[in-house]
Amino acid sequence: VVAVEPSVLIDATAVPADRGGVGRYVDSLVAALDADGARITVVCQPRDARLYDQLAPRSRVVPTVQSTATRTARLTWEQTTLPMMARRLAADVVHSPHYTMPLASPAASVVTLHDATFFTDAVLHSSVKARFFRAWTVTALRRASLCVVPSVATANELAKVTRVEAADLEIIEHGVDVERFHSPTPEEVRAARDAIGLGRTPYVAFLGALEPRKNVPALIRGFARAVLDRPDPPALVLAGQPGWDTQVEKALDAVPHRLRVIRAGYLPFDTLAGFLGGSELVAYPSLGEGFGLPVLEAMACGACVLTTRRLSLPEVGGDAVAYCGVGAGDVAAALTELLDDPSRRANLAAAAQRRAKEFTWATSAERHREAYAKAWSRHRRAR
């Protein structure tokens, strides 16, 4: 715990309604900071006020008055109302947890930058989104008192594409919500199967948005190759928000009719442990992540995980997951090997769950408190 505790205003207005990775980061961090006794105020969209009241019962929660539902409205609010709010609340630090930040705030500023793929793999994002986040990343690196990144890989990637030194970035790993992501009970597995309509069919699981960097077309093609000649093939279940990867439909159309690929769409949070932990294995052949929360969450559920060595994923998986290349052939070979070897899957699942225990939101909250104190100290020296 830091010696002199700054008061921190956390801007949770950028959290999308479906939560996603940034939502899980902000929600879990706020809860852990509150439990740790940090001096925080959370400003959020009105729809999230009750949630943050529950997550942070010791802290002040302030819903926005004017609309921040669209990106333009939120940015306008961030640049005008948020600095006034920081002044009124006498906040020492404003934490902006998703790239953008108020440029005229009286407080010290901490900005979380989640990954560098807007620079390194811009084609994996829409062009508008890539330009927007590139511009704000550069601005945050130049203007913020301190920038937080979730992995060594992200720090190194940002150092390559901007003028920042990796050592100047605060590397703070995410944790995992063990109440939500845990070894599922048989009832939880059954409930997840019922939600998907699977019956008793074994399945390979994927959880994430269907966007290009998740590499879902290669997963679909690799899965089809791996299981086509099996007498009793498992299903492939794609769970998560629909994205904008146009190649997914083409890959699905090419799947032989005797194989089952299920697009489960958005699954309620209370079914995720059963979905991940009840699978034969979780496949996540991503082209690159800033951290890799879906991999960590699957590990915490006691799943055997197959992922890639791209960017931060080995920092999360260590020796407790299986790795493959990003091509369909690579995915097919790795899936075949794992499906043929139940004992290896069981060993990896046990190792994954042990490793997942090393990533806690309590530790992340402690490190964020140190970052807030450092940012506040820098800000006072600069005035």
Describe the function of each predicted region.
Residues 1-383:
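Carbohydrate transferase catalytic cores enriched for Leloir-type hexosyltransferases
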